Amino acid sequence: MTGAAPHINEQFAEAAFSNQSVIFDDLYSGDTIIGYKRKRVRDHILKYLKSGGSILELNSGTGEDALFFAKEGFKTHATDISKGMQQQLREKVAKHGVQHLVSNELCSYTELEKLNNKGPYDLIFSNFAGLNCTGELDKVLSSFAGLLNPGGMVTLVVLPKFCLWETLLVFKGKFKTAFRRFFSSKGRKAHVEGVYFDCFYYNPSYIKKRLKQEFDILGVEGLCTIVPPSYIEGFAEKHPRAYKILTGWEDSLKGSWPFKYIGDYYIISLRKR
């Protein structure tokens, strides 16, 4: 059933990702397409963010991106609602000796006003659909301006309401997956490690509309528009030549219409005036 109260849905999401935290890196760290997605997001950010800046990361997970940015010389305050993910992140940060560059805090992105470390920051960053786990994205977005330096950035990686690859799965008889984004205004059920919670889809226009008073758009890119989504497992390994061709096409067309709007995700960046 969809439509759980926001705080209840948040508790379900926390439980799901805490369950997944101990196996998260084993599940995803070796996946070729996930590696491609991470590189695309990081390259996008590095185009705009000045070296040595400070980052507030939302839904930071086990800290893969926080570690990357630490190695690039950025300071990151990594937040998450999942106790399990925060524990994995702390262990990883200690292992790599970057405690001086990565701090962490257990905090919901719907309650950023409660942050102990309020910055201000040069970038607020949310990767890989973390923000799709709330039906209160408007509340999250409204808190951004006060946490940023003048000229600070927001970069979000979000699932839109339409994905070309996903819709094409109808031809494989996967009707539930093919149409799951079409009737999702009240949320669609997601299932992670034995726990169900509601997932919501947002187009770039939703974010632009709610931030337009204080932010300018820097860019929107489609992600896994031509390259298959990572849940089509093993594609890159089974079809290396096709994968290489598709990545080349996507890299060329990522910021063009309609490709920037029909991927599994989109990357959107905005700058505070």
Go through the PLM ranges and name each one.
Residues 123-136:
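A short SAM/SAH-binding and catalytic strip from SAM-dependent methyltransferases
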Residues 209, 218-273:
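A C-terminal cap/extension of S-adenosyl-L-methionine-dependent methyltransferases
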Residues 138-153:
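A short glycine-rich, Lys/Arg-flanked "PGG" loop and its adjoining helix->strand segment in the class I
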Residues 62-112:
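Class I SAM-dependent methyltransferase SAM/SAH-binding core
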Residues 114-124:
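A short acidic, Gly/Pro-enriched loop at the edge of an enzyme's catalytic core
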Residues 190-206:
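Acceptor-substrate binding/catalytic loop of class I
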Residues 1-50, 64, 68, 153-184:
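Conserved class I S-adenosyl-L-methionine
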